[in-house]
A protein has these predicted regions:
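Short helix-capping/linker turns of helical repeat alpha-solenoids
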Residues: 39-43, 57-61, 73-75, 80, ...
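Bacterial N-terminal signal peptides
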Residues: 11-22
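Canonical positions in the second alpha-helix
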Residues: 54-55, 90-91, 126-127, 163
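Hydrophobic face of amphipathic alpha-helices that form TPR/SEL1-like repeat modules
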Residues: 32-39, 51-55, 66-73, 102-109, ...
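Terminal, low-structured helical/coil segments at or just beyond the last alpha-helical repeat
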Residues: 171-216
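Bacterial N-terminal signal peptides that target proteins for export
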Residues: 2-12
């Protein structure tokens, strides 16, 4: 899931928030956010930033995400990775899946913060359980390589399958490698049906999706 897809989904939720939300205050904040988004989309980044900044300071998570994105890319403000991370971290703490993915990525790459694969996995897991495909892909990579978690090809397959389900095409690059590993899997306690591990991984993916990612 890329940033534009994420934003479009949020805007769909915004419509429901305004019409079915809890009062005029919510509608006013969301309206201000939407107007700023229109400015941003038209290339007037400074106007958008001026509108989002007070909303973000008041704790509006989507505005915090947009500030994180703008500071990361130098759109309407001077590029500043530290400030970008700070805003992403604030939104991530409020449960925003895109922000959680970005925080996890920062810990993976050692950008702004010290690299820490275990912390990265924690944030990817939070985003993945909200159906965020890129985070699901990163979990697949981490389980495949045993980075921040124990190496687990079944869980790597599960998250890779779910990432593809949610439109993260990049996951197709490693799915074949994971399947190859599963088909050659033999536990230490003796002979094992070569197709059993793959079947188990497929069932894990099915159950995870059916539970809306809550039993993964």
């Amino acid at each position: 899931m890329d940033f534009l897809v994420y934003i479009n989904r949020l805007l769909l939720g915004l419509v429901f928030s305004i019409f079915f939300g809890s009062g005029a205050t919510l509608a006013g904040v969301e309206e201000d956010y939407a107007i700023a988004k229109q400015s941003f989309d038209s290339g007037d980044y400074k106007t958008a930033m001026a509108a989002w900044a007070p909303l973000a300071e008041e704790g509006h998570s989507r505005s915090q995400v947009m500030l994180g994105y703008a500071y990361k890319n130098g759109m309407g403000v001077v590029k500043n990775n530290k400030t970008s991370f700070r805003w992403y971290a604030k939104a991530a703490a409020q449960g925003d899946s895109y922000a959680q993915f970005k925080v996890g990525s920062a810990y993976t790459n050692g950008e702004v913060v010290l690299g820490n694969n275990q912390t990265a996995v924690k944030w990817f897991n939070l985003a993945a359980k909200q159906g965020f495909g890129n985070a699901q892909y990163m979990l697949a990579v981490n389980y495949y390589n045993g980075r921040g978690v124990g190496k687990d090809y079944k869980r790597a397959y599960m998250w890779c399958t779910l990432a593809l389900h949610n439109g993260t095409r990049l996951a197709s690059n490693i799915k074949g490698q994971i399947v190859k590993r599963l088909l050659s899997y033999h536990p230490k306690d003796g002979w094992h049906d070569e197709s059993a591990a793959l079947s188990e991984a497929q069932e894990m993916a099915r159950v995870c999706l059916a539970s809306n990612y809550q039993t993964c």
